[in-house]
Amino acid sequence: MRVLVLGSGVIGTTSAWYLRQAGFEVTVIDRQPGPALETSFANAGQLSFGYTSPWAAPGVPKKAIGWLFEKHAPLAIKPGMDLAQYRWLWQMLRNCTHERYAINKARMVRMSEYSRDCLNELRAQIGIEFEGRDLGTTQLFRTQQQLDASAQDIEILAQYGVPYEVLDRAGIIQAEPALAHVDGLVGALRLPRDQTGDCQLFTRRLAQMCVDAGVEFRFDQDITGLEFDGDRITGVRIDGKLETADRFVVALGSYSPALVAPLGMRLPVYPLKGYSLTLPITDPAMAPTSTILDESYKVAVTRFDDRIRVGGMAEVAGFDLSLSQRRRETLELVVSDLYPKGGDLSRAQFWTGLRPATPDGTPVIGATPFRNLYLNTGHGTLGWTMACGSGRYLADLMSARQPQISTEGLDIFRYGQYGHAPQQENRTCVLPAR
């Protein structure tokens, strides 16, 4: 049975790997000249299985008003003429309650913890290397209010059996010795089972292993639309030519909604623009040990072999990929405060990418109203964290195997209005130019 996977980021590539392991004939299509050249290219590098949290949280609406006037605000909204932007923001606001936050975080932790197990199993099986470290994540709190607010997260972590430690200043320094000079830290939440690693390196190496296993990758090819007949996809238009298969997987990140919208599916995925700096390490003893998350700025500082990756922030600004000097200054501020002697900012590489975010934080994985069309998208800032679990979960669904975790609340049907596909024949669904 032939499957076309649309997209070769970390989500598309892990999907291809697990589908091939399940016995499918797999072809991956992407417009880029290679894998992991968009959102997966230079993300924060954190595998934050325990830290997993939705952006839609209690208190965010009130904070967002204050952030409008802050230079280094973690979240920025740039209003445009896109109705999808306003619809997405409204849905996000509706998820900023204690009840919805608990439901959404529990779903995300379920997938993230499963993904950790899948990644560990994959590493043991194929020995893939990606500058990975298994030294945990430390979330820094600069105010007592931030520390107190972590209580709800801790409750959910305990519910799922995720190990954690609440650290005082001495505990922070023990975990991350290079932070001994930093004043004003009131505490931290440490998640010892979290990991780090270079997402792009992982994806490129896994793509090569996919090829060795028989997966075909076709690059520099534009996906221009879908065709369907009744409740089945009959083919995908690639550079204007129709390509047929038995099943199709949409793993196009922020561009997924544009492809499926003409099918009558309103997929609530919107790009959250993020930024990163990558700088060479100058003094290993003064660099991070693993991943640090600065709660005040929502910025992560991650250690690779000989590099520091600083990433974070979220802009609701559509598909704008311009680089903001103001955002660069925020990243430089955080890394200079925490690790002033750790890396060379004068040689830093500045990057931006679009994370495909749902308003509730949970990705959209699984079946659709079309019998042979599947989704694997909407992971937001946690695509790298959830990639292996999402790929394995999808392959199990498509193989009619019982997934190892609950399927509750993970597919598009949780949004309610997608139960019926349009019953038109031989219609072409055109994907706008990207």
UniProtKB/Swiss-Prot annotation:
Membrane spanning stretches: none
Gene Ontology CC terms, in alphabetical order: cytoplasm; plasma membrane
Coiled coil location: none
Disulfide bonds: none
Cofactor(s) recorded in Swiss-Prot or TrEMBL: FAD
GO biological processes: D-alanine catabolic process
Gene3D superfamilies, per the entry: D-Amino Acid Oxidase, subunit A, domain 2 (3.30.9.10), FAD/NAD(P)-binding domain (3.50.50.60)
Binding site for FAD: 3-17
Domain of life: Bacteria
MF terms (GO), sorted A to Z: D-amino-acid dehydrogenase activity
One Pfam family hit: DAO
Known EC number: 1.4.99.-
Keywords per UniProt: FAD, Flavoprotein, Oxidoreductase
Pathway: Amino-acid degradation; D-alanine degradation; NH(3) and pyruvate from D-alanine: step 1/1
Reaction catalysis annotation: a D-alpha-amino acid + A + H2O = a 2-oxocarboxylate + AH2 + NH4(+)
NCBIfam families the record matches: PRK00711.1
Family under the similarity heading: Belongs to the DadA oxidoreductase family.
Function: Oxidative deamination of D-amino acids.
HAMAP family: DadA (MF_01202)
PANTHER family, A to Z: D-AMINO ACID DEHYDROGENASE (PTHR13847:SF280), SARCOSINE DEHYDROGENASE-RELATED (PTHR13847)
Protein name per Swiss-Prot or TrEMBL: D-amino acid dehydrogenase
